[in-house]
Amino acid sequence: ITYTDCTESGQDLCLCEGSNVCGKGNKCILGSNGEENQCVTGEGTPKPQSHNDGDFEEIPEEYLQ
């Protein structure tokens, strides 16, 4: 399954290495090998839902507090 760099929630929370999320005001840059993603300053850009249900990974509730 390939995940996009942002979640579909529109909350500017991006999936980064180790399932960590970038906080508001940050965006995720995908590493070339898919393992060295970095959170950097900048607004995230949520991608539209595609035809594949698994394109987006749910954010664990512990990150949404």
From Swiss-Prot:
Residues 1-3 are annotated as: Interaction with thrombin active site. Gene3D superfamilies: Thrombin Inhibitor (Hirudin), subunit I. Disulfide bonds join 6-14, 16-28, 22-39. Hirudin is a potent thrombin-specific protease inhibitor. It forms a stable non-covalent complex with alpha-thrombin, thereby abolishing its ability to cleave fibrinogen. Glycans are attached at residue 45. Belongs to the protease inhibitor I14 (hirudin) family. GO terms for cellular component: extracellular region. Residues 55-65 have a biased composition (Acidic residues). This is Hirudin-2. It comes from Hirudo medicinalis (Medicinal leech). The modification Sulfotyrosine is found at residue 63. Residues 39-65 are annotated as: Disordered. Its main location: secreted. Residues 55-65 are annotated as: Interaction with fibrinogen-binding exosite of thrombin. It holds the Pfam family Hirudin. The keyword Disulfide bond applies. The keyword Zinc does not apply. One of its GO terms (molecular function) is serine-type endopeptidase inhibitor activity. It is found in: Secreted. SUPFAM superfamilies: Leech antihemostatic proteins (SSF57262). InterPro entries: Hirudin (IPR024793), Hirudin/antistatin (IPR011061), Prot_inh_hirudin (IPR000429). Keywords: Disulfide bond, Glycoprotein, Protease inhibitor, Secreted, Serine protease inhibitor, Sulfation.
